[in-house]
Design a protein with these regions (language model features):
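"A position-specific structural signal for the A-helix of alpha-solenoid helical repeats
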Residues: 85-86, 129-132, 171, 175-182, ...
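Extended, charged low-complexity segments
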Residues: 186, 190-229
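N-terminal alpha-helical interaction modules that lie
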Residues: 1-81, 99, 105-163, 193-197, ...
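Short helix-adjacent coil turns
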Residues: 52, 60, 94-97, 184-187, ...
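Short coil/turn linking the two alpha-helices of tandem helical-hairpin repeats
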Residues: 92-95, 131-138, 177, 182-186, ...
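Residue signature of alpha-solenoid helical repeat architecture, marking inter-repeat boundaries
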Residues: 78, 121, 166-171, 187
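Hydrophobic/aromatic-rich structural module bridging two neighboring secondary-structure elements via a short loop
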Residues: 80-102
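Basic (Lys/Arg-enriched) interaction patch that binds polyanionic ligands
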Residues: 89, 171-181, 192-198, 202-206
Length: 230
């Protein structure tokens, strides 16, 4: 765990490095130190086989990177930063979706590259890293939404104009549809049907939402009949 003085130093160094066109030796050394920390932490993670244990370890490690992240976002320079993009992905893995989206907005706006081991675009990574666990959770328990609808809506808005495979965007629309169908709000249920329809259009063979759409349409029809008799 970093001391308050170390946290302050890392934030200031990150801000200065990203605010300067020609970072000083001290600022570059600070970045190299963060990359070294990242390599060591990745080595620790590589020795862990359980995905849950990996997520727990990432959650434990992330606070030491937060001052650097705040400095980068404050400088808002758009320089590439492997620490920033890696932390964004770790936040997805830990379920800290709000922070992942906060960083993701910056990464997408500045069109920053992903770390070398990721051969997907930022938008694709964000959608898959967030929505794959959401859909897996719904498969295990369809009655509980693992991520709030407003966060998934934010992800949709963030990636709306970004290029990605249709199958990937279909996952996001399916996750949104499954989340909104758990409400008793007619508007949300109507939106759920529309999202699931869009998911089916983008991935007609594998979306697997035909039955869900039928059930939702029946529920909406019953709701309309009930309101007509009030």
């Amino acid at each position: 765990m970093l001391t308050p003085a170390q946290q302050h130093f890392n934030r200031v160094m990150a801000e200065r490095r990203h605010a300067s066109r020609e970072p000083s030796q001290l600022e570059m050394t600070a970045y190299e130190t963060m990359l070294h920390r990242l390599r060591l932490d990745k080595a620790r993670l590589s020795r862990v086989q359980s995905q849950k244990a990996k997520a727990d370890l990432k959650r434990e490690l992330l606070p030491d990177y937060q001052p650097w992240i705040e400095g980068v976002l404050t400088a808002d320079s758009g320089q590439s930063d492997d620490v920033l993009t890696t932390v964004m992905i770790w936040c997805c893995d830990c379920g800290n979706i709000a922070e992942a989206l906060r960083i993701g907005q910056y990464v997408l706006r500045h069109k920053l590259p992903m770390p070398d081991q990721y051969r997907r675009t930022t938008a694709t990574v964000l959608v898959e890293e967030i929505c794959d666990p959401v859909l897996a959770a719904f498969k295990a328990n369809p009655a509980v939404a693992p991520v709030a609808a407003d966060l998934l809506e934010a992800l949709r808005g963030l990636t709306l104009n970004e290029d990605m495979p249709d199958e990937v965007r279909s996952k996001l629309l399916k996750a949104l549809g499954y989340t909104l169908r758990l409400t008793d709000n007619v508007e949300s249920l109507t939106a759920a049907v529309e999202y699931l329809r869009q998911a089916a259009v983008l991935n007609p063979k594998k979306a697997g939402v035909t039955r869900d759409i039928e059930l939702l349409q029946r529920a909406l029809k019953k709701s309309e009949i009930g309101r007509a008799h009030v």
